[in-house]
Amino acid sequence: MWTLKSSLVLLLCLTCSYAFMFSSLRQKTSEPQGKVPCGEHFRIRQNLPEHTQGWLGSKWLWLLFAVVPFVILQCQRDSEKNKEQSPPGLRGFPFRTPLKKNQNASLYKDCVFNTLNELEVELLKFVSEVQNLKGAMATGSGSNLKLRRSEMPADPYHVTICKIWGEESSS
């Protein structure tokens, strides 16, 4: 769409500049009608109208150059609006409806939510291991830092902020 607009405007500018450039170079000579000097003899000139207009001088042609691109752009704009207003099933793919923007956004949100949940689980596992190491160091078994399976908490996913900071909850 952008290329169509730019090409139409470029063509219009080129034709206008061509017309103004070469129309100024054309000299308007006033020669008498009838016999015109041509070398040593006279040439008989046909009766032509005094102000003959070429295709560059026609106002209707320039109006056409200005109106046609405008009409084309308006028709394309209207067809785009109609496409946006029509249901997606009627736009040429009756058997497959394309994903809407809301569905794409919800898929993105689901992916982000799942990633954050996985990150939270990994963080809780890490905090639980650090807490167990801290407990093992406090009990005096500093020489044996390897934790056995029996020292792992029963529910590693249930770690609260109070437990992370070492505060005991009052409840």
Swiss-Prot record:
Residues 1-19 form the signal peptide. Disulfide bonds: none annotated. Residues 74-171 are cytoplasmic. One of its GO terms (biological process) is spermatogenesis. It is a single-pass type I membrane protein. It comes from the Eukaryota. This is Protein FAM209B. Keywords: Cytoplasmic vesicle, Differentiation, Membrane, Nucleus, Signal, Spermatogenesis, Transmembrane, Transmembrane helix. Belongs to the FAM209 family. The primate lineage appears to have undergone gene duplication of FAM209, such that humans contain FAM209A and FAM209B. May play a role in sperm acrosome biogenesis. InterPro entries: FAM209 (IPR027943). The chain crosses the membrane at residues 53-73. Residues 20-52 are extracellular. Pfam families: FAM209. GO terms for cellular component: acrosomal vesicle; nuclear inner membrane; nucleus. It is found in: Nucleus inner membrane; Cytoplasmic vesicle, Secretory vesicle, Acrosome.
